Amino acid sequence: MAVAVLLVLPFIILKLNAIFHRRGSLPAGGGREIYLAFPAPGSELEFIQAHAEVRIPDSAIEIHALINKSDTRVRFNLPPPDFSLFIKDTYCDQPFSALNPRDVRCEEHDPDWWRPGAAIDLEKCTGGNSYIHQQILKDGSDRGSLVIYVLTLMEAFETPSE
């Protein structure tokens, strides 16, 4: 058991170091808000994906992101056939379940584009690991285009004791 921990520990430390390095590059006064009408090579898409820990399909449009030191919120529109491609690269480890939009709390500091509570047909999926908690919300109100909400939270963790 101790040998397995020692073998895995360097990989965990490298991953956490990369996450803290990314988070440390954010402005001191708050988060960074980004809008992309469509994904373009060389754009800030890679920055968004790295912080949200998702892969946004090329067919996504109207991409909004708010990246803070402790969480990342992303919202984008996606054609329904591309949803299965997107969900494979998330931390969702449970099937989607219906969610009453009235049960979604909106905070006063939420950006204008973060409104899952306004959906008519909302589903959620959650997952994560020892340092990330991710929630995916799928708004299927418009059958021609899904609105996807991604909330990725940094989990509190403790340094392994010796």
Named regions from a protein language model:
Residues M1-N17:
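Hydrophobic membrane-insertion alpha-helices, especially the h-region
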Residues V5, V104-E162:
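An acidic-aromatic pocket/loop used at catalytic or ligand-binding sites
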Residues L9, P39-P41, Y149:
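Low-complexity, intrinsically disordered/propeptide-like segments
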Residues I19-F76, F83:
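Extracytoplasmic low-complexity, Pro/Thr/Ser/Ala/Gly-rich segments
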